[in-house]
Curated annotation (Swiss-Prot):
Gene3D superfamilies: Ribosome maturation factor RimP, C-terminal domain, RimP-like superfamily, N-terminal. It comes from Streptococcus pyogenes serotype M18 (strain MGAS8232). CDD domains: YlxS_C (cd01734). This is Ribosome maturation factor RimP. It is found in: Cytoplasm. Keywords: Cytoplasm, Ribosome biogenesis. Pfam families: DUF150_C, RimP_N. Transmembrane segments: none annotated. One of its GO terms (biological process) is translation. Required for maturation of 30S ribosomal subunits. Belongs to the RimP family. HAMAP family: RimP. The gene is rimP. One of its GO terms (cellular component) is cytosol. NCBIfam families: PRK00092.1-2.
Length: 178
């Protein structure tokens, strides 16, 4: 094959998917860089890298027992910002704004440990594939044994229990019961 010939992909890839793949590696690199430096009493909850309008935002979500303060976010920003400048090669294709903040009421539950700690809480679960034609469940997390989430959710006016394999879960976050 001549090096001048175009490469034809068998499967078309949307630009959004390419950006998502690139963002995943940026998130992984940032997570590996900042995790060792976020020490107790703080806990790294999540790292997000998204485009908002024409701006790129790198969000570092941090929490601690009793919640974080504005002073905490300022102190953490002063630790994290210089660390990001040391990453070589620079993983960021564009300039970005660094945001260090609390995960808020609808904090993501990224680990098995965070799910175990959330038993008894009201959560929102998004699945890779639907279970009984439902792809998003919102309800009380009754149990989590490391492999299966048991959720009590409302289907119209009836309470139902669903067991969801952990491998089927795309995203989980705390939810606010209205």
């Amino acid at each position: 094959m001549d090096s001048q010939e175009p490469i034809i992909l068998e499967k078309s890839i949307k630009i959004e998917e390419v950006i998502k793949i690139a963002n995943t590696s940026i998130i992984d690199i940032v997570t590996k860089t900042v995790t060792p430096e976020i020490k107790a009493p703080y806990e790294l909850v999540d790292v997000e890298y998204d485009k908002m309008g024409s701006d790129y935002i790198l969000s570092i979500l941090v929490d601690k027992e009793g919640g974080i303060t504005v002073e905490d976010t300022s102190d953490l920003t002063n630790i994290i910002s210089p660390l990001l400048d040391t990453i070589d090669p620079d993983p960021f294709p564009n300039q970005y704004m660094l945001e260090v903040s609390s995960p808020g009421l609808e904090r993501p539950l990224k680990t098995a440990d965070s799910l175990k700690a959330a038993v008894g809480s009201y959560i929102n679960v998004s699945l890779y594939q639907a279970i009984d034609k439902v792809k998003v469940f919102q309800g009380d997390l009754l149990a989590f044994d490391g492999e299966t989430l048991t959720i009590d959710y409302l289907d119209k006016t009836r309470h139902k229990i669903v067991n969801i394999p952990y491998q089927a879960v795309a995203k989980v976050r705390m939810a606010v019961k209205l």
